[in-house]
Amino acid sequence: MNRALHEKPELTNARADFYGRMAEQSMTPLWEVLHTLLSDAPVTDATPHKWDYDLCRPYIMESADVISAAEAERRVMVLENPTLEGRSCITEALYAGLQLIMPGEVAPAHRHSPAALRFIVEGSGAYTAINGEKAYMEVGDLILTPSWVWHDHGHDGDVPVVWLDGLDIPLVRHLGPVFAEPYPEAEFPKGRPTGDNVARYGGNMLPFGDTYSSQNSPVFHYPYTQTRETLETLAKSGDTDPRHGIKLEYINPTTGGPVMPTIATYMQMLPKEFSGDAYQTTAAWVYHCVEGSGQTIINGDTIEWKAKDTFVVPAWYKHEHRTNGDSFLFSFTDQPVQKKLGLFREAA
């Protein structure tokens, strides 16, 4: 015998009276709300959406005339999911935004408990300094600012630089442990030389006697030139996944796991005229097109994308990628949290 999930019981006068008296002790009846708390499949308030960079860019550039990086702390245009209006998030657990820094500017040093990533969209010559070590930006680079590390941004070049921010702020706010602290000066004191993090931990070797132990990757700069070369080399084998093309995860080299405990990051190469099988998971995915163009069909609706566009696939939405030519998609997801809690699922 099949049994349906709980439905809301009939509200009688006697029950309404009982509920009113119960409320005086800050109690409510579970059976009145159980149907909203449990469901036969994940329910999300987020909706699929694309941010066309050509339409967003004029506002990004105009923001430089409206407010300085120093006054804004971080001059970011939040990519707010249209069905999560006012909540400053792209999904219930993830935040995304497009940040601008102009030549000569400094976005002052601070640190916070939410973890963050920067994926470079446009320009070069700017940098992020992590505990004083500078990572210079090129389009397609991934730069991490993990939880509670000092970081500031600056610009030694001569063209505007824009990057995609990805953070776990909504998740951390929901759980409660949000902390933030400004550094007393605009810039953190000079640290290790540029490239030290990659040399120390990114060459498939570890320094002798190293005792590094953290869920955050000690490598915080993943250059796109290396990522792209790796994907192109793998493409020569012809071993293409029917759902993902050729997809690689950026990892913490000391653990083999995700770069940060709450956010996993990926880059995938989808060959010309790729038509992928559907993929469905309990995690939400934020995609950004680095090169190429194509379409993603999300629960039957098609999103057209091209280089520099960003789009979101909420939890438990089926999606399948199709391409016009060779395309490269960066993505980040809340998958690691669900895996650690034993909640992550993929549809067969």
Enumerate the language-model features and the residues they cover.
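A short beta-loop-beta micro-motif enriched in histidine and acidic residues
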Residues: L84-Y95, M102-L117, G132, T255-A264, ...
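Hydrophobic alpha-helix feature that most strongly marks membrane-spanning transmembrane helices
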Residues: S275, H288-G294, W316, D334-V337
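A short, N-terminal "cap"/entry segment at the start of jelly-roll beta-barrel domains
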Residues: M1-T91, F188-T262, Y266
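Double-stranded beta-helix
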Residues: N2-R15, D156-N216, F220, T323-A348
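Conserved metal-binding segment of the jelly-roll/cupin
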Residues: I130, Y136-G157, W163-D168, I298, ...
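A short beta-strand-loop-beta hairpin characteristic of the jelly-roll/cupin
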Residues: M102-V139, T145-V149, G154, Y279-A307
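C-terminal structured domain segments across diverse proteins
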Residues: T254-G257, I263, M267-M269, T282, ...
